[in-house]
């Protein structure tokens, strides 16, 4: 029952976010940015790997390049300027 409620809440949040985006972009700041990103990443099934997992494959030198976009730039891209859901997903 709790899982169904969580899924329904997440889907309604995603639907609300998509309807609030004029021309596919929206400004996300603070707690709203964190929650939206968490919901989108959870829905997409993204599983971030830690540095220890990269080291276990013997490719620790690849870690800085393989993690995708850093978290520092998300505020610049999505809070100071409007961004799309695709940009948010690139931070998962």
Curated annotation (Swiss-Prot):
Keywords: Cleavage on pair of basic residues, Disulfide bond, Hormone, Pyrrolidone carboxylic acid, Secreted, Signal. The lineage of its organism: Eukaryota, Metazoa, Ecdysozoa, Arthropoda, Hexapoda. GO terms for cellular component: extracellular space. The keyword Transmembrane helix does not apply. It comes from Bombyx mori. The keyword Secreted applies. Silk worm has two kinds of PTTH: 4K-PTTH and 22K-PTTH; there are many forms of 4K-PTTH. Heterodimer of a B chain and an A chain linked by two disulfide bonds. It is found in: Secreted. This is Bombyxin A-4. Residues 1-19 form the signal peptide. Residues 50-70 form a propeptide. The modification Pyrrolidone carboxylic acid is found at residue 20.
